[in-house]
Amino acid sequence: LNPELGGKVLPAGSYILATQVLEKRLRQRLLPQNMAVCDQNVALDYYRLSADGRLLFGGACNYSGRDPRDIKAFMLPKLLRVFPELAGTAIEFQWGGMIGIGANRLPQIGRLKEYPNVFYAQAYSGHGLNATHMAAKLVAEAIRGESRGFDLFSRVPHMTFPGGPALRSPLLALGMLWHRMKDLL
């Protein structure tokens, strides 16, 4: 990464389980409004029904840089805390990957100071599917010279994570452990 940006984003693992297709009555009982839901924890969990009737349950940010050996074993207890009635339901798919997280959890959109013709958009903090479309539009408009929205986002300050490359991830893991403990209380 460019040195100007490198310390502003940390990688974190995020994981998702997909159940077998659920019966219609069960789906209606679990999510009667068929809406996407997330909790209010710092490292949030989220869930929704897929178009074919599966429950998709995701979250469990992992800041260690290592993926769990078994995503299902890692995520299933979280799913069952929210939906105990799904005990015994088959998990047919599981996947995960790295996301980029910024300290303030806001997308980082701007241009490099040293190379003002180089634009960047990063650190969607798990909201990339939604925010990348907006960021791409803002960057495209800025390239065309219409930069009002781009300029607004590029003025948002983004701190560099403390600790330098060697301590950045361990310090974040400690900080997130603190927030996790608060979430549990």
What are these regions (language model features)?
Residues 114-120, 124-185:
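C-terminal lid/capping helical subdomain adjacent to the catalytic/cofactor pocket in oxidative enzymes
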